[in-house]
Design a protein with these regions (language model features):
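Secondary-structure boundary elements
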Residues: 176-234
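Solvent-exposed loop/turn segments at secondary-structure junctions
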Residues: 207-213, 240-242, 267-272, 291-292, ...
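Short, basic/low-complexity N-terminal boundary segments at the transition from targeting/disordered tails
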Residues: 121, 258-261, 323
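Active-site neighborhood of thiol-dependent amide/isopeptide-bond enzymes
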Residues: 215-281
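Loop/turn elements at helix/coil->beta-strand transitions in domains of secreted/extracellular proteins
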Residues: 195-200, 256-261, 289-290
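Extracellular adhesion/carbohydrate-binding repeat motifs centered on closely spaced tryptophans
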Residues: 3-180, 218-219, 265-288, 297, ...
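Non-catalytic ligand/cofactor/substrate-binding and regulatory segments of enzyme domains
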Residues: 173-185, 202, 206, 306-325
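His-Asp-centered catalytic microenvironments across diverse enzyme cores
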Residues: 153, 251, 287-325
């Protein structure tokens, strides 16, 4: 009897397991549970240099950097008000710096001529600052603007100086005289001197130190630029007459920044011309309406005519020439 009960129990269990389950509205699907994949967040770099077209930006902790110097992977950059890295000659504060096409400051390149985006720059310091104004490089004259960009295919000083596509000035009388006088002024003066002190140092060079000798013929006063040609000849040969002395002082004055420089062709008492009126041809200088006579001082027949408000001896004027033209 016990054995029969056990068998009946097993049969009931089997029947229960084999009976399909029906819901009120049909079969109910067993839900499938799937795991959602975990997304690892991408970390924002602390420092990031981005290049978009020809623009370079720098981000620090996700924020664009502006008006700051930054060094990245060994290179130094400056990012301006718009966030762009500076390229070429750039003014930062009151100083100019030069950056290459990739925005890298041109460090440790003192004394080198570099080209960035077809512009020439002469690097003056190891921290990437360029030369500005007039300068001489490998015996050639250049001029650079306030950002260090050399003039190319342009003129200066009312066309007297022409700068070629290479940035070098055409080597004519004007450029050669400019370089000669620049070198002498640099040697004879110091930055601490006033303009008048510098002019006096140049005067002393002419009348005492240069070793000039009197000689040569008078220049052709009808030719344009005769005074600059005469000054260059005087400095190169150390020989000249009153026109040479006057023209040389005028060239120094121009280099020092004087603007009103005139050569006076006149006659003063003397016998050199053997003229019956007792006068002879002579040339002296007027700078900012002050009179200077370097040849008279050098020769000793009239000394100390430096910065006079009038010309101190009897004379008459034939013609006044503007040295700046």
């Amino acid at each position: 009897m016990k054995k029969i009960k056990i068998l009946l129990g097993i049969a009931m269990v089997v029947s229960v397991l084999t009976i399909p389950v029906h819901g009120a509205e049909g079969d109910t699907a067993i839900p499938v549970i799937s795991e959602t994949p975990q997304i690892t967040p991408v970390e924002t770099p602390v420092r990031e240099l981005r290049v978009e077209g020809n623009k370079i930006f720098y981000y620090y902790k996700g924020k664009m950097v502006r008006n700051k110097w930054k060094r990245y992977e060994g290179y130094k950059y400056y990012f301006g008000e718009d966030g762009y890295a500076c390229i070429g000659g750039s003014k930062i504060g009151n100083k100019a710096y030069v950056f290459d096409e990739n925005g890298h400051l041109l460090e440790n390149q003192k004394g080198k001529m570099r080209t960035v985006l077809n512009k020439k720059y002469c690097i003056a310091s190891d921290n990437g600052q360029p030369k500005t104004g007039y300068f001489i490089y490998h015996n050639d004259l250049y001029y650079a603007d306030s950002k260090g960009r050399c003039y190319q295919n342009r003129t200066r000083e009312d066309g007297q100086l022409y700068f070629t596509s290479s940035g070098k000035a055409r080597k004519d009388t004007n450029a050669l005289l400019k370089m000669r006088v620049m070198n002498l002024v640099s040697r004879l003066t110091t930055p601490e001197m006033s303009k008048n002190q510098k002019l006096h140092a140049c005067w002393e060079y002419i009348v005492d130190d240069a070793g000039f000798q009197y000689g040569g013929s008078d220049p052709d006063l009808k030719k344009a630029g005769w005074c600059r040609k005469t000054a260059l000849s005087m400095l190169n040969t150390k020989v000249g007459n009153c026109y040479g002395f006057a023209s040389t002082l005028a060239a120094f004055a121009k280099e020092l920044g004087y603007k009103k420089i005139e050569l006076i062709d006149g006659r003063t008492p003397g016998t050199r011309d053997h003229a019956p009126d007792g006068f002879t041809g002579h040339c002296w200088v007027r700078i900012d309406n002050r009179y200077y006579d370097p040849e008279a001082d050098w020769a000793g027949w009239m000394t100390g005519v430096y910065g006079y408000s009038f010309y101190p001896i009897r004379h008459y004027v034939k013609k006044v020439y503007n040295f700046m033209r």
